[in-house]
């Protein structure tokens, strides 16, 4: 599924799908946004932020935010657009993220959610001296996970097909 098809799908749902990118020192920082526009007012319902390195395992997902009262399929559009963008525009074929230890019990929910999306656990990042570099990159401790871009995109495509949206 291509970005252009996802943008058309978003439009059919009354939404706007945008991808912003900037390059700094060989890193491509990106932001995927799903919003709704009414007259001159834009409401951002959700976004994904991250960066890419120029290799197959280079997609790094940093922030996923979806508002609680958002319309249906916001997170699915964000995931699909992020994976489609990476596959179309970068050499990245897998994504990495950290389910950060924020609140008691919330980390387990994040890990469960990311597993449903198609991610698997690489390792627990904690207070071990060997984890210092990863803690600096991700800004904390948590569960480091990886997922394959094609399979995550396919999961979203199957969901859209089941809802007769594509």
Model segments located where?
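Non-catalytic substrate-recognition and accessory regions of acyl/acetyltransferase enzymes
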Residues: 1-73, 80-99, 103, 107-120, ...
């Amino acid at each position: 599924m291509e970005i252009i098809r996802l943008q058309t799908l978003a439009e059919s749902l009354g939404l706007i799908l945008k991808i912003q990118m900037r390059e700094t020192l060989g890193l491509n920082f990106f932001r995927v946004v799903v919003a709704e526009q009414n007259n001159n007012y834009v409401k951002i319902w959700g976004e994904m932020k991250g960066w890419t390195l120029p290799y197959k395992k280079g997609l790094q997902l940093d922030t996923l935010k979806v508002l609680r009262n958002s319309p249906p399929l916001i997170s699915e559009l964000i995931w699909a657009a992020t994976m489609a963008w990476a596959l179309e525009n970068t050499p990245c074929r897998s994504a990495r993220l950290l389910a950060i230890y924020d609140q008691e019990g919330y980390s387990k929910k994040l890990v469960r959610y990311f597993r449903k999306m198609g991610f698997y656990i690489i390792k627990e990042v904690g207070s071990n001296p060997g984890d210092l570099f990863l803690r600096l990159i991700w800004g904390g401790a948590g569960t480091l996970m990886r997922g394959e871009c094609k399979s995550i995109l396919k999961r979203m495509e199957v969901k859209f097909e089941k809802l007769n949206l594509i």
